[in-house]
Each structure stands twice: as structure tokens, then as C-alpha cells.
A protein has these predicted regions:
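Catalytic core of membrane glycerolipid acyltransferases/transacylases, capturing the structured
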Residues: 1-18
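Non-catalytic C-terminal accessory region of glycerolipid acyltransferases
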Residues: 21-127
Length: 127
């Protein structure tokens, strides 16, 4: 997945307070230029972890504030199949692109963020 993330020009969310202002300015600029942003709402990706962890608010705050949809992607891990069985030892990663989720503009910003977060979590959880 690391190679896919780099290919998509992804960058980590800074933990240091002094770096966050620049980070959010880059995000605002990207959204104004209609760029696609990829974020892990859990805060980081744990390869081969098969449960959905709690989502942080940052990605949803960004989407709700900018009134842009989020595009959930569910990563699942499956045993190698087909030709992959011959040489792959670790599980294969499957990505399922789910329906986009739009912010509910009838809600105030705080509720909009929470609503977006909850709907994304529900959509990604495997039944």
C-alpha cells in the first residue's frame, strides 16, 4: 500500500501544532483547485489489521467545512488466490470503492462533521 500512497501524492497529517497551519493551507489550496485528497480517518494505516478502528475528526472536518464529499474505500485482506498463490505469502489487499458521502448542509458545522463521520464509519464496516 505504501507504493500506492506515494503514487497518489499522499502526505501524512502532522502531529506537531506548528506544522498544522501550513498543512491546512495546503489542503484548502488543493480543494480550491478541485484536487482529490486521500486521508485515513483512523489517523494511520495499519497493514493487515482487519478491523475498523475509531475515526478521528480531521478528515471529516475538512470535508464538512469545504462542503465536499468523501469517497470511502474499504480495504480488506484475503488469502492469495489465482496466480498469486504461487508466490505470495501474505494476504492480498482488496480495495472496494463505496458510494460517495456528501455533507448534510442542513446541519450546523459541528453536527455535520459528526454526521459525516458516523455515515462513513457505517459504510466501511464489514457486515
Amino acid at each position: 500500500i505504501r507504493h500506492l500512497i506515494r503514487l497518489l501524492h499522499a502526505f501524512p497529517i502532522p502531529k506537531e501544532k506548528e506544522k498544522k497551519k501550513d498543512f491546512y493551507e495546503q489542503i484548502d489550496s488543493a480543494l480550491k483547485h478541485k484536487k482529490i485528497l486521500q486521508m485515513y480517518p483512523e489517523g494511520s494505516l495499519w497493514p493487515y489489521y482487519d478491523k475498523v478502528r475509531n475515526f478521528k475528526y480531521g478528515a471529516f472536518k475538512i470535508a464538512a467545512s469545504a462542503n465536499v464529499p468523501i469517497q470511502p474505500i474499504r480495504f480488506t485482506f484475503v488469502k492469495p488466490y489465482g496466480i498469486y498463490r504461487l508466490y505470495k505469502k501474505k494476504d492480498c489487499i482488496e480495495a472496494t470503492i463505496l458510494d460517495p458521502i456528501y455533507p448534510n448542509l442542513d446541519l450546523d458545522l459541528t453536527r455535520r462533521i459528526e454526521d459525516l463521520r458516523e455515515r462513513a464509519y457505517i459504510s466501511i464496516k464489514v457486515e
